[in-house]
Amino acid sequence: MRKSEAEGLISEAYEAWEAEEWLAAAALFERVLARFPDEERSAVWWYDAALAHKFLRNWAKAYALGREAAARAPRGEGDPAFWNLGIAATIQGDWATARAAWAGFGIELPAGEGEIDGRFGAACVRLDTGGEREVVWIDRLCPTRGRVMNVPVTAGRRFGEVVVHDGEPTGRRVVDGREFPVFDELLLLRASELPTLEVTVNAGEVADLDALIALFVEHDFGAEPASSLEMLCSCCSEGTHEQSRKVHAGAQRVSLAAPEEEARLLLERWAGETAIGRSWSGLETVG
């Protein structure tokens, strides 16, 4: 292959890219890179080929091509080649490469080897389940993984599952003046064994409802009052949205994440802590 032919193929690749024909674009980049892996612009082509496979959710290819892109990227300067490799390596379970990628990007990690289990703060993730989208809170374990801390209302999703999310925020949530990024989900990495239950509770005061939530959290379970849910259009969801707590007292449905027998015991304990004002009924498994 001559360089003039390679230039033509690269032009075709970017035409395919503009049309969002990711597979065709990646194939053209790879064809050129097989002959010219280390030209001045090759680092960009490696990156774009890896990115195309990321869009296709072909993580094995995104990982292999991402390694080549990162090998040609400057370390410690926030180069996105390292971020995309960190995502792909995490999904592939290659923790050594993931750690090296985050360090190459310029992120300080907890010391150690193997799976990263750090404290990277709270954020939100927009779950995408068959086109049904729901924003939930996560506890970030690394730059791209988080544990779901809400009880999702989306069928098939669970409290405690670990998801992989993208690196570019697609929205913001503001709570008490503090901004939190909203990331798009890329993959459900680890399912949760905790079933989702629903129960009707009667809480005399908001403090009674808070006590129920705190009791489940204390046992590493989840409790989500229906009154805390908020429906947003996609435009608002992907913008900056100020979020405030809106739970109320009275009879309402509450979603729980816990084994059924343990949920019953905790509900009985909660109801029995006061003489009046707390009751529950209709506990059932929903997911």
State each model region's role.
Residues 7, 41-44, 78-80:
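Start-of-helix register in tetratricopeptide repeats
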